[in-house]
């Protein structure tokens, strides 16, 4: 059987300080990829870094709001400078409002749409040019509403 290897690949998993994103990033690390993740707050990035370290993974964490195009562009440029060009993007960052829809305000729904739909577009837009230059890349989008 051929072993699955991501040696030499850089994987950015958004919102991967914990939960599904953390589990996905751990799988990429176990396959040999260099793991990069972001979260919206420094405290979440710090907790994520500690969790990866506890699992024996050297991850790279960045504070970035995926709905802010300037922050995303700056993060991607910083990752490319410090870690390398992103080969794999997993758009995992998301938000869920745990309230009945009929109780949700339009502003709350717009926040969900902004993070869960616009965020993946903004991050993908930032990484695609380098993927095109390299001649390859993978983008995986995860979304729930």
What residues fall within each predicted segment?
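Conserved glycine-rich cofactor-binding loop
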Residues: 10, 17-19
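Substrate-binding pocket helix/loop in short-chain dehydrogenase/reductase
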Residues: 100-101, 108-113
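Conserved glycine-rich Rossmann-like NAD(P)H-binding loop of the short-chain dehydrogenase/reductase
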Residues: 33-48
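Flexible N-terminal pre-Rossmann segment of NAD(P)-dependent oxidoreductases
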Residues: 1-10
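The beta1-alpha1 cofactor-binding region of Rossmann-like NAD(H)/NADP(H)-dependent oxidoreductases
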Residues: 42-43, 62-75, 106
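Residue(s) in the substrate-gating loop at a strand-loop-helix junction
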Residues: 144
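A short, exposed helix-loop element centered on a Lys and neighboring polar residues
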Residues: 124-125
């Amino acid at each position: 059987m051929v072993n699955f290897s991501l040696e030499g690949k850089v994987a950015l998993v958004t919102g991967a300080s914990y939960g599904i994103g953390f589990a996905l990033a751990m799988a990429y690390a176990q396959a040999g990829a260099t793991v990069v993740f972001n979260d919206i707050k420094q405290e979440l990035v710090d907790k994520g870094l500690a969790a990866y370290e506890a699992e024996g993974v050297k991850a790279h964490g960045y504070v970035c709001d995926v709905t802010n195009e300037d922050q995303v562009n700056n993060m991607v440029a910083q990752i490319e400078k410090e870690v390398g060009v992103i080969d794999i993007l997993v758009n995992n960052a998301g938000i869920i409002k745990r309230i009945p829809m009929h109780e949700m305000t339009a502003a709350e729904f717009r926040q969900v749409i902004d993070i869960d739909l616009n965020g993946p577009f903004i991050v993908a837009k930032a990484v695609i040019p380098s993927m095109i230059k390299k001649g390859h890349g993978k983008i995986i989008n995860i979304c729930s509403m």
